[in-house]
Amino acid sequence: MERSVFYISDGTAITAEVLGHAVLSQFPVKATTFTLPFVESATRAQEVCEKINEIYRETGVRPLVFYSIISPEVRELIQHSEGFCQDIVQALVAPLQGELGVSPQPVLNRTHGLTESNLGKYDARIAAIDYALAHDDGISLRNLDQAQVILLGVSRCGKTPTSLYLAMQFGIRAANYPFIADDMDNLQLPAALKPFQHKLFGLTINPERLAAIREERRENSRYASLRQCRMEVGEVEALFRKNQIRYLNSTNYSVEEISTKILDILGMSRRMF
């Protein structure tokens, strides 16, 4: 089943995308998506409606429209398009208003925009991103006392994207350190990491998956051979066990899932909002 899907917002459209995708993922739908942020005026809304209506005329199938818009005028224009329109935030606001006994006070861009109340947390996330970049792949072992978690693992097991996701999404200062082929003859925990053992967390991966990932980077190399990958993974997992370092097999998990599992296992709190 194929459908055109619109994510529309008067802000970044991140909320519409996340909630809309979460709902749509429950159905066997192949989606052609259109993300339209900052639909703040009637003129812009009319343009969006024309696009929705054009697709309906061409296909004969109503596009699915997930939107989050504060302006009643803009919202009404979207609702009168030829799409199947779902106001994803209002569907939750109405029952919550009844429970709380107070009226909502919507403010444009409050969710993902900068406000006085969230500026400090935004700055913390930027600082966490800077930290992750400065401490990626063992570039620097200085200031590890400032890290909240230090990820360890073989090359290409997911350390860098996980570190950056932890920083961007949760404001977590994450460093990461790679174990490379040259380390394998006498693999030990580096002395610089030992004082921070309580912050260490290992990532591992199935050798077959690791070989496939490395093959894309260095085709037909020793680095990408299944034999090399099996050896490295085995040695590093043994190191984790010897040093009682908690670790996770990342093979079947997305970066989002890996990050969330790390926070859960380590008992770390999120800083999203």
UniProtKB/Swiss-Prot annotation:
ADP binds at residues 153-160. Belongs to the pyruvate, phosphate/water dikinase regulatory protein family. PSRP subfamily. NCBIfam families: PRK05339.1. Keywords: Kinase, Nucleotide-binding, Serine/threonine-protein kinase, Transferase. It comes from Yersinia enterocolitica serotype O:8 / biotype 1B (strain NCTC 13174 / 8081). GO terms for molecular function: ADP binding; ATP binding; DNA binding; phosphotransferase activity, phosphate group as acceptor; protein serine/threonine kinase activity. This is Putative phosphoenolpyruvate synthase regulatory protein. GO terms for biological process: regulation of DNA-templated transcription. It is an enzyme of class 2 (transferase). The lineage of its organism: Bacteria, Pseudomonadati, Pseudomonadota, Gammaproteobacteria, Enterobacterales. Coiled coil: none annotated. Its EC number is 2.7.11.33, 2.7.4.28. It holds the Pfam family Kinase-PPPase. Bifunctional serine/threonine kinase and phosphorylase involved in the regulation of the phosphoenolpyruvate synthase (PEPS) by catalyzing its phosphorylation/dephosphorylation. It catalyses: [pyruvate, water dikinase] + ADP = [pyruvate, water dikinase]-phosphate + AMP + H(+); [pyruvate, water dikinase]-phosphate + phosphate + H(+) = [pyruvate, water dikinase] + diphosphate.
